Amino acid sequence: MENIKIIPSELNGEINIPPSKSLAHRAIISAGLSEGVSNIENIIFSEDIKATIRGMKSLGIEIEDITNEYKKGSERSTLKVIGKEKLTLENDTIDCSESGSTLRFLIPIALRAEKEVTFTGRGKLVSRPLDVYYNIFENQGIKYKTSNNELPLTVDGKINPGEFHVKGNVSSQFITGLMYTLPFLDGDSKIIITTELESKGYVDLTIDTLKKFGVEIENNNYKEFIIKGNQKSTSRDYRVQGDFSQGAFFIVAGILGSNVKTLDLDIDSLQGDKAIIDIVKKMGANIKVGRDYIETKKSKTHGITIDASECPDLVPILAVLGAVSHGTTKIINAERLRIKECDRLKAMATELSKIGADIKELEDGLIIKGKYKLKGGVVDSWNDHRIAMAMAIASIKCTEPVIIQNSMAVNKSYPDFWKDFEKVGGIIDEWSMGK
């Protein structure tokens, strides 16, 4: 089902939102760095999570799917993770597939094994920037080898405690990688943020997850993070929360047509993408927020200016909502989307234009003049999960079918997306396009 044809229809029903990919990465790593056994509940085996599991296994961590003995009949998996304090390199190559989190989290962690290791990947990940780490390698005398700053990357050396200067306007994944490494070194460290920190929510998730596993990091107003050395992570059982960045697609689906209730979204979550609630409220959406669910109904929405610096993953679906909202929607501070799985600003401008939206790229965002209806047509996912899902939701407001090429890009984060889309009334057919 690489290419699919969607017949426009309004969606109605309940969706059990998949677990947070951001929290699943962090929980698996925290458990792996904790001496003893942890059971991590509510896991789906998306391509990115499989990459992190492979990576941790390469570092000598035992991980086993125990769903049948732990929670028989559950749609979601439970992992038994046998962690250890001292990492041992069991495989000298770590394949990160297309997962930026896996790559950037595990590079500094792997240096604790003090053995040469090579990181590989594919797709856009091969060329996504790693300059923050290259600077650290050079400052600390860690050997590394790469061709034109692209994967594969081979590193060999030992990371030492100290001061680490990191720009705040590049990916927070580098900060997370350091936070998963520095507490376990023989000495205290400090991460100093040299520009305004964006995506604070992801850093909050890291600090909170580490704390739940017994590791403390002092946050000095997001300007510096003070980290005591020689800490120990403690094994525990942990349930991964539902994912607001995935829930956002069905939250908007309810706004565009009929009534959708998204389940397993914790209103007290630290996830930055919880911002979807306030953003759609400001746009005039009919939304009801419960303790662990969000319900949206068909609404007349209006354009606003959206600062995406703290919630970049919401931009594709917010662009869809803007395209069918009254007036003008402007998305700003989203320049980092140009170095995601694809250039998401260009992708959304290109693909929404194909189905009749009035949308233009800005250097750091998008400007969208809303229309009541879109027309349908052939679009491409750019092999990006969020583009594929956004275009599926856009079909609700189309007058003709939408054909999405490379639709299985959703496997990166949400393998059951098409099943869930049909569950609430989406009508899809496989579409060969000559294949």
Swiss-Prot record:
Keywords: Amino-acid biosynthesis, Aromatic amino acid biosynthesis, Cytoplasm, Transferase. The active site is at 313 (proton acceptor). GO terms for cellular component: cytoplasm. It catalyses: 3-phosphoshikimate + phosphoenolpyruvate = 5-O-(1-carboxyvinyl)-3-phosphoshikimate + phosphate. Phosphoenolpyruvate binds at residues 21, 100, 128, 173, 344, 386, 412. The keyword Cell inner membrane does not apply. It is found in: Cytoplasm. Its EC number is 2.5.1.19. GO terms for molecular function: 3-phosphoshikimate 1-carboxyvinyltransferase activity. InterPro entries: Enolpyruvate_Tfrase_dom, Enolpyruvate_Tfrase_sf, EPSP_synthase, EPSP_synthase_CS, RNA3'P_cycl/enolpyr_Trfase_a/b. Its main location: cytoplasm. It holds the Pfam family EPSP_synthase. 3-phosphoshikimate binds at residues 21-22, 26, 171-173, 199, 313, 340. GO terms for biological process: amino acid biosynthetic process; aromatic amino acid family biosynthetic process; chorismate biosynthetic process. Pathway: Metabolic intermediate biosynthesis; chorismate biosynthesis; chorismate from D-erythrose 4-phosphate and phosphoenolpyruvate: step 6/7. Catalyzes the transfer of the enolpyruvyl moiety of phosphoenolpyruvate (PEP) to the 5-hydroxyl of shikimate-3-phosphate (S3P) to produce enolpyruvyl shikimate-3-phosphate and inorganic phosphate. Belongs to the EPSP synthase family. NCBIfam families: aroA. Monomer. This is 3-phosphoshikimate 1-carboxyvinyltransferase. It comes from Clostridium novyi (strain NT). The gene is aroA.
